[in-house]
């Protein structure tokens, strides 16, 4: 809602109890405060929170500012990362690149970026009881990486193919 300007869409989405609000490239303190209030209302039993969704691929492709991911996380909000894969502003579905951009351009730690792309993404789509983490009763959707020193290498080795294998429902995906 705030891809190019703050149009008040964050507050509207929170008031309407939308599950998520995307395109937060322009996201100031008022918008962040509105998201905090939405989380507090949800914790008080007033519906689900409105998840803030960053789309760093759009920022990269359009050369516009990045969502203030660090400020959103520091405010205690569950940042979500997504691709917004479309031919106009984000012609890529590469989630590894999204995680890298969040780490390199939004001030998000690699471990936070992975959580934003998995756990928080599943929560924002209301499927966290099925996917988003490796847990008993969840579908086994995950990736194996090539050998790395640690999760920080995903961002540091920003041009390397770090994913070795993809598993969907516990089966190797050959796609």
Map each language-model feature to its residues:
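Active-site-adjacent C-terminal substructures of enzyme catalytic domains
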Residues: 5-133, 158, 174
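Cytochrome P450 C-terminal beta-domain/meander region
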Residues: 135-137
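C-terminal cap of metal-dependent C-N hydrolases
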Residues: 139-175
